[in-house]
Every structure is written in structure tokens, then in C-alpha cells.
Amino acid sequence: LRAYMTPRVASRDTGRRPEYRRGMTAPYRVVAVSGSLHEPSKTTALVGAITAAIAERADIESQLIELTQIGPGLAGALQRDQLPPEVEAQLQAIESADLLIVGSPVYRASFTGLFKHLFDFVGQYDLVGKPVLLAATGGGEKHALIIEHQLRPLFAFFQALTLPLGVYASNTDFDGYEITSEVLEARIALAAERALPLVGYAASRPVELLVG
């Protein structure tokens, strides 16, 4: 089992953020999932920025799963054993991650259908106690509640540890596909800071104690 990450807090007058050290343990496995059906994508840019913020604060190995890449092999499968090997490998990465960063554009008032189809194949108990950072993009602020009304209930079914602070971005936060909003950048940084202690806690707990 991994040891709990202990923050080393800098003195107040330095203005430096806490640094997380993990000793001799392996890097945390961070898997980001973009539910966008387009490339390039604001959603992919957002989950990438969140992953980068985590990487600035902890030792990680990251992987990005894009539905634009695996969608054709995913869409036609009705059972998990019908999935092509490359999609099965992505599912195993999701199930074995220490932290999931999941994001979807708002599509017909919810996440994309292929995003849901992907998680329909995830084992019912394979995300128990797993930290999940929720993110979404939409055309305006009126769609921001997708995180609370759509994404959070989905991962509550899996008994995942959804982080209280989600990250929503609208079109005005981007110039093309580049994040330009200082407010959004600050929220990404705050989400990363708050995620790390929970990732360390979850990684130190035997999953057998969490399944019930």
C-alpha cells in the first residue's frame, strides 16, 4: 500500500504552496478522460490543464483517454468482451488509476452518450473509494450544474470519492482552445490542491474496507 502523502507546508511569509512528497513509493497513476467527440476540443484542453496542475504538485504518471480516439471501437460493443483490445486496455487504466479526471462537454443537457457508454463497461466495484475530479465545458454558465446533476450521481453509483470542487468552463474562458481566464486557472489550481490529500488517503486504504 502507498503511504499517505504528507504535505510540507511553507512558512506563511514565503507565499509558496504545500509540496507533496511520497518518499520511495511509485508515482500516482492519473487517468484523464475527455468525453468530447471533437478534435481539437475545449474539454480535452480543460482536463489536460487539470492534469498539468496535479503534475506540478505531485509525482504522477498520466494518461489521457479521448473518445475521439477510441469511439469507433467502443460504440459498436454491447458487452465488454466485444471491445477491441485497445479499448479494454483503456478500461483497465481507468479501473487501476489512483485519480480519475473526467470531463465532458454539455450535450443535450447531459454528458455525451459515448462517455456514458464507456463507463457502462467499468466494473461496478472497480471505482469504490477512488478519487474522481469532475469537469465539464459548455457554451455558457447556465450549463454549470451538469457537474452536480449529471456527473456526480453517475460516480456516486460507483461509490467513487468525487471531489467536492468541480471545474466548469464556458466558451468565454478560452481563446480558441487555449485557456485564457485567470478565474478558471485559479479554480483549476485550487481543485488540484484539494485533490492531493484525498488521493493520498484513498491510496493508503485497502479497497476491501471500502466495498460494502
Where are these predicted regions, by residue range?
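Glycine-rich phosphate/pyrophosphate-binding loop and the adjoining helix
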Residues: T162-G212
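Conserved strand-to-helix beginnings and helix N-cap segments that scaffold or border functional pockets
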Residues: T43-T44, T112-K116, A144-E148, E178-S181
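Short, glycine-/small-residue-rich phosphate/pyrophosphate-handling segment
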Residues: V132-S170, V183-A186
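N-terminal beta1-alpha1-beta2 submodule of the flavodoxin-like/Rossmannoid cofactor-binding fold
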Residues: T6-P7, D13-D120, A186-A189, P197, ...
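Mobile beta-alpha loop/short-helix "lid" or hinge segments that flank ligand
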Residues: Q63-G73, F157-D175
